[in-house]
Amino acid sequence: MAAGSTGERPFFEIITSVRYWIIHAVTLPAIFIAGFLFVSTGLAYDAFGTPRPDTYFQASESKAPVVSQRFESKAQLDLRLK
């Protein structure tokens, strides 16, 4: 072990090992696929409570609503949603 070493394997040695690539050849694509499905099925919208893209505006509106009173913004938006 070299002076000042923490006892960990060097990064280059890790990424050039066959064991690393056997493990990561499965886990990295699985994480990507899971994330893609999480977003594409709409589960992300439900999990985080964000509105879906088609519910940002009501059908009668053509642009984003403008809040005119800073401290009464919630009341203005609630009135808009009724």
Swiss-Prot record:
Q: How is the cofactor bound?
A: With its partner (PsbF) binds heme. PSII binds additional chlorophylls, carotenoids and specific lipids.
State the UniProt keywords alphabetically.
Answer: Electron transport, Heme, Iron, Membrane, Metal-binding, Photosynthesis, Photosystem II, Thylakoid, Transmembrane, Transmembrane helix, Transport
The cofactors it requires, by name, are: heme b
- Residues that span the membrane, as ranges: 22-36
Kindly give the membrane topology term recorded for this protein.
Answer: Single-pass membrane protein
The record, for SUPFAM superfamilies, names:
Cytochrome b559 subunits
Q: Name one GO molecular function term.
A: heme binding
List GO BP terms, alphabetically: photosynthetic electron transport chain
> What do the Gene Ontology cellular component annotations say?
photosystem II; plasma membrane-derived thylakoid membrane
Q: Domain of life, per the record?
A: Bacteria
Q: What is its main location?
A: membrane
Query: Gene3D superfamilies of this UniProt entry?
Result: Photosystem II cytochrome b559, alpha subunit
Residues holding heme = 24
Q: Where in the cell is it found?
A: Cellular thylakoid membrane
What family does this chain come from, according to its entry? Belongs to the PsbE/PsbF family.
The record's section on PANTHER family has:
CYTOCHROME B559 SUBUNIT BETA-RELATED
Q: What function is annotated for this protein?
A: This b-type cytochrome is tightly associated with the reaction center of photosystem II (PSII). PSII is a light-driven water:plastoquinone oxidoreductase that uses light energy to abstract electrons from H(2)O, generating O(2) and a proton gradient subsequently used for ATP formation. It consists of a core antenna complex that captures photons, and an electron transfer chain that converts photonic excitation into a charge separation.
HAMAP family according to UniProt: PSII_PsbE
The record's subunit annotation is:
Heterodimer of an alpha subunit and a beta subunit. PSII is composed of 1 copy each of membrane proteins PsbA, PsbB, PsbC, PsbD, PsbE, PsbF, PsbH, PsbI, PsbJ, PsbK, PsbL, PsbM, PsbT, PsbX, PsbY, Psb30/Ycf12, peripheral proteins PsbO, CyanoQ (PsbQ), PsbU, PsbV and a large number of cofactors. It forms dimeric complexes.
The protein, known as: Cytochrome b559 subunit alpha
Species name for this entry? Prochlorococcus marinus (strain MIT 9211)
Gene assigned in the entry: psbE
